[in-house]
Amino acid sequence: VIKNNGDEDTPEEQRQMHTGTGRIATLTMYPMSLYESKESSGEISFLELFDNKSLDIDGITSKLSIEELIMLACRGGWPDSLNVKSERAQLLIAKDYLNKVCEDDISRVDSVQRNPELARLILRSYARNLCTLAKKTAMLADVKVEMETTVQATFDEYVDALKRLFVLEDIDAWCPAIRSATAIRSGKKRCFIDPSIAVAAMGASPKSLE
């Protein structure tokens, strides 16, 4: 990065500054898709499904079995998982990541000390409500079963920290037609950045999900 904000002798408040807007873009990176990890053929394109009305997908099937797909969801899209052969070792990656987030990262993200056990309870509640329109009040009630002193403000603060750590990512409601008179749900779906974190939060395994 080249930086030149003016002569070093110029007072800081008088130097010309540039925020980078229009020249520097931010890019959010996600764990790998099955196509990126070479486990999906990529024969069906999401873009083509929407843009190509004549696209024919009849007869196209995945070469992966249900059991294999479950294992891959539990493993997740972590690049390190491709470097280990043992399925047991692959499953440990998401578990270790979850432990690191709860024990360390959630307090380090903004230098606010947080309770690792409460973080685990919130992640477990999210996992129970994965890809649903569950309300925060319902998830808070779930957490309060084991930690009854938790209040909504604390719950929201932890969720915000977990989103900044790219662990949680709620998905906004999708409206295909802006002018459509059809009533649609506007709530957000409760999701993780990778399904393997939800599996780890629940203490589940490929066998228990089959």
Positions of the model-derived regions?
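Conserved nucleotide-sensing/catalytic segment adjacent to the nucleotide-binding pocket
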Residues: 1
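Interdomain motor-coupling "hinge/lid" segment immediately C-terminal to the ATP-binding subdomain
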Residues: 4-128, 132
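Accessory nucleic acid-recognition modules appended to NTPase machines
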Residues: 82-210
